[in-house]
Amino acid sequence: MKGAKSKGAAKADAKLAVKSKGAEKPAAKGKKGKAGKDPNKPKRAPSAFFVFMGEFREEFKQKNPKNKSVAAVGKAAGERWKSLSESEKAPYVAKANKLKGEYNKAIAAYNKGESAAAAAPKKAAAKEVEEEDEEESDKSKSEINDDDDDEGSDEDEDDDE
């Protein structure tokens, strides 16, 4: 009885077969992925805490040159930020608000340019398609195919040289 399986092993195999079938179905559908990030899009403005973190990092590195842990820097900065009063946080908040205003202007310009840039290529592409359609409609299908064949034969002649 070397090849015989127990009932438990047979059930486990059946469950695996069901799971593998279920796993194959979503892959077959082909999910739509996220659109890639635009490298030209302005970076978001930092909050007051992150403005503070930029300065605190430099101080922390000077005081603790051997400590390279990002977690230690973050923890120390968080504790220090909590201990600051509102008046001590005010310069960081003001700087963050200034950066946020600059970001809002930059993102508005980006969005304005993006919408104009997106509309222009669509119109140009539509005109090109219309022009091609007009040229092709004057010719019969056989003439269009002959033109395509002629273009391909030119490439073959270049290879011989």
From Swiss-Prot:
Region of interest called Disordered, as start-end residue ranges on this chain: 1-46, 60-91, 113-161
Localization: Nucleus
Keywords, in A-Z order: DNA-binding, Nucleus
PROSITE patterns, alphabetized: HMG_BOX_2 (PS50118)
DNA-binding region, residue intervals: 42-111
UniProt superkingdom: Eukaryota
Annotated Basic and acidic residues bias: 10-27, 77-89
InterPro entries recorded: HMG_box_dom, HMG_box_dom_sf, HMGB_plant
Coiled-coil residue spans: none
Position of the signal peptide: none
Record's compositionally biased regions (Acidic residues): 145-161
Molecular function per GO: DNA binding
GO CC annotations on file: nucleus
Compositionally biased spans, kind Low complexity: 114-123
A Pfam family the protein falls into: HMG_box
Annotated family: Belongs to the HMGB family.
Name this polypeptide is given: HMG1/2-like protein
Native source species: Triticum aestivum
